[in-house]
Every structure is written in C-alpha cells, then in structure tokens.
C-alpha cells in the first residue's frame, strides 16, 4: 500500500491561513466610535471567552407610543441585557431633575412620542450580560435631558436601582478592544481596580496607552 508523504517542517503563511484554512470565515472588523458626539448614543464594551473584546454601540431614541417611556428593544439582546434595560430606565428617570421630567411628560401629553427605543447595532451578534447597565443608564439619561455624550468615551459596569456600580469581567479585553475602536477615555467600576492595576503594569512601557484616560 502506498502512502502520501509529508515534508517536515510544514510552512504555513498568513496567506494560507486567511485564504485557504479560514476562507469560509468572515474577518472581524473592530467597531469604531461614532463620528461625533450626540444625544442618546454611547459606547459600551464587551469581552468574550475567546479572548476578544470591543465596543457595543448603544443608541436611544424616541418613538410614538401611548405609554410614557415605554421600552422597545432591538439588536438581538439576551434576557439579562433586557433586564439591565429596565433597571437603567428606572434609574435614569430618577436622576433627571423634576423640571426636565415635567417638560418631558407635558411633551408626551401633546405628542404621544415619548416611548424609548433602545437599539444595539450589529443585530447578527448576540448580546447578553449585565455589564452594559451603566452605559444604558447614561444613554437614556442623555435622551431624557438632551445632553450630548462624548463620542470618544466608553463605559462598562453593572448597575443597580440605587445607582451602585459593581464589578465586571474581562476588563483588559474590553480596554484593548475599545482602543482598537478609537476610544481614548474609559470609565470602569472601582471594584475592578486590581484588574486595572494589573493591566497598567502589563502595558506601562507600551505607547498603546499614550494620552489614554481612565476613571
């Protein structure tokens, strides 16, 4: 019986990987920050078990509704993330000053256009987990008050109804992914300080963090 022989060592080029072995897979392109600052648009952050991370764009806008601040959610959001949306709406509305909220209610009574539509683009990518809670809260608050959110900022952190922000996982992957997307300012939970310190120690001699701010 005749067998094929294999020449060792085997040389595999980047071209082979991309166009031969992985030709049926789509190349991942990091999501970029918005072109400009705007009301109701914020950068959340994600990380997964595959060692990847990046930006989750979160958008909030009004839509016609007979119920004040009725939520409409789109963008393939999981159950945990949907719960975060509900918590965020309750918290954000409690943070808005009385005069502004009164004006929103008066506007609703006239227009019936104050339902809140929250959308996470890239609908083909499933999104779940509570770590976007803080970003969603800020996004809804921005919509209710008409205040712009800086387009270069990204925020991560689980949040409860009292406004306490708690720890999240994968901070290092989220920061690295955010940097690829153009983020220059990160906001993260105090409970993740050790993760942050470890990250800074690892990259302290790298120009990667030049002019990058953390809060």
Language-model regions, residue ranges each:
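Peripheral, non-AAA+ core regions of ATP-driven protein-machinery
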Residues: 4-215
